[in-house]
Regions:
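Eukaryotic intrinsically disordered, low-complexity regulatory tails and linkers enriched
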Residues: 257-298
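C-terminal motif of bacterial Sec signal peptides marking the signal peptidase cleavage site
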Residues: 38-40
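Bacterial N-terminal signal peptides that target proteins for export
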Residues: 2-30
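Amphipathic alpha-helical scaffolding segments comprising HEAT/armadillo-like alpha-solenoid repeats
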Residues: 51-67, 88-103, 123-135, 154-166, ...
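Structural detector for internal amphipathic alpha-helices that build alpha-solenoid repeat scaffolds
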Residues: 45-55, 74-89, 109-123, 129-132, ...
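Pro/Ala/Gly-rich low-complexity, hydrophilic intrinsically disordered segments
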Residues: 224-258, 262-264
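Short inter-helical turns and helix N-cap capping residues of alpha-solenoid HEAT/ARM repeat scaffolds
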Residues: 71-72, 106-107, 137-138, 169-171, ...
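TPR/TPR-like (Sel1-like) alpha-helical repeat modules
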Residues: 198-203, 214-217, 226-236
């Protein structure tokens, strides 16, 4: 009986492979093509939305209305971002709003955007308010606070920067930004914290700490903590006479739509001196290009 069944099974398998299986394959190909088209349509609609927005951006009144919306955190976030990036975003009324959101807003994204706004338009006296957010439970808030302290100079915040930077339980994205911020403080506690960060597990943290040490000392012992410390102990004046620090900025290569929207040319922020820092102590040879992230992965 088994000999009679096998030919039938083989015949059915052959029919399935010849007639039915190709249909499944073609259906699968159609599904894949459809998914690709839907994805490209979504991308194109997003690009066209950006193009439309560049023709008719929200008015200042609309941005302010969104930022002050007490019922919608997304509107608050969107409005705060628009105000922060406007030339007039540093007026006293808006500064008061940013400070209020940093201190009291319950939404972490709104708080992070307010920190970014204070970083752009704040004063040296805002450093303490910003530094408190390094103890926030939300990582995005802590990263925004650390980045803000790269732009706001106050030697009194070095203790909390050192504490966050040397805590290996802290998220590495926070410690990277802290290491960059410490590059503006030529002090023993900053140096010791940066040396400790060179020995941490994450390579990105190590490199950020080494960059700050090079800025502070004009020496480079790479990621050798022992060599850094022995050199430091042997020198009575280990730090540069002139400051080299500029807060870093981000740049990227222009894309297709950046060239199409010629009426709204894309510009990038240049590295600058943190508010509260004495610019007269800045070395004239400081090159802004050294503080730019060009966004290239080549």
């Amino acid at each position: 009986m088994r000999n009679h069944i096998l030919p039938a099974v083989k015949c059915n398998a052959k029919l399935w492979l010849v007639n039915i299986f190709p249909k499944y394959i073609s259906l699968g190909n159609i599904a894949l093509v459809a998914m690709a088209l839907m994805t490209s349509c979504d991308s194109m609609s997003s690009d066209f939305a950006n193009l439309t927005n560049s023709f008719s951006p929200p008015s200042p009144a609309q941005a302010a209305q969104w930022a002050l919306d007490p019922y919608d955190a997304e509107n608050q976030r969107r409005g705060t971002v628009l105000l922060a990036n406007a030339p007039w975003g540093g007026t006293p009324a808006y500064l008061a709003m940013y400070r209020l959101y940093v201190e009291d807003n319950a939404d972490p994204l709104v708080k992070a955007c307010a920190l970014d706004a204070l970083a752009r338009h704040g004063e040296a006296s805002d450093a303490q308010l910003v530094a408190k957010q390094l103890q926030n439970k939300n990582i995005q808030v802590k990263v925004a606070a650390a980045k803000a302290l790269q732009r706001i100079h106050d030697p009194q915040v070095t203790s909390i920067l050192c504490s966050r930077g040397t805590d290996e339980n802290e998220d590495s994205s926070v410690r990277i930004e802290v290491a960059i911020a410490l590059g503006q403080y030529a002090a023993d506690d900053s140096f010791q914290a940066l040396c400790a960060m060179i020995d941490q597990r994450e390579l990105a943290v190590n490199f950020a700490a080494n960059d700050s040490l090079r800025l502070l000392t004009d020496h480079d012992f790479a990621l050798d903590r022992r060599l850094w410390l022995s050199w430091y102990r042997a020198n009575k004046k280990p730090f540069r006479k002139e400051l080299q620090y500029l807060y870093p900025t981000y740049q990227r290569e222009k894309g297709f739509w950046d060239h199409i929207t010629f009426w709204a040319p894309l510009t990038f922020e240049k590295p600058g001196v943190p508010v509260g820092m004495d610019e007269s102590k800045l070395a004239p040879s400081t090159a802004p290009e050294d503080f730019q992230n060009l966004g290239n992965t080549k």
